[in-house]
Amino acid sequence: MFDNFFSLDIPGEVISSLIVILIIMVLSIIIGIKAHFQDPLKRPRGLLLLAEEGVKFFDNFAGELAGHAMPNFGGFIMGVAVYLFIAFIFGLTGLPSPVTYMAVPLSLGLTTFLLIHFISARFTKWKYFKRYVEPFPFFLPVNLISMWAPLLSLTLRLFGNAIAGWVLLTIVEYALRDLSAMVFSFIPSDWNQIFLAPIPLAILHAYFDLFSGLIQTTVFISLSAIFIGQEVPEELSFNTLVNERR
């Protein structure tokens, strides 16, 4: 449907991803406007209340898993979580899900991967390079290979689960079409081919796009927070936590 968008050879999943980003941008603008005109003496309601609770939740979530030395890290985690969850449930519309396109999980995994090394270099300075020759210098090749483990883990885990659901849904859809054509072959029209499909496919879509999407989103942001939190010195995170509680 989207593959020839405006006569451009762009994969449908990429267009879906742009739509998801547009949805998030519109929601952000609406929340920003509501926050601007919100009376500080009154309790927020509706979308603004949801956004406020979301910010609190992801700030605490990031603090628990990644430490308290990065006060703004919860915003990154929240942004990734919102994008991923909407991207998963986007398949409920019948349009391509962005997560089933390898470039999308790879981009998310690469973002976390680069952030891991940026945080490590920021807090450890020149000692960052020492990690590649520990415990002995001849471990350099092994360490250079193992440094890619978080990128592969995050990308392949996310893409594998998304594409597995898509493959299963496709197989079930074709099987139900053939079964419907066989059972209702006496009905002279094409609609009999999808007669049995709506209810089973709706249930599977609800699982893979909604329930499984929530699980995969949670797993991805949890691993991202843990991987990044491992690069923050423990004493720095502890001192920040102590200062916050004073």
Which residues make up each language-model segment?
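Selective transmembrane helix interface/packing segments
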Residues: 1-246
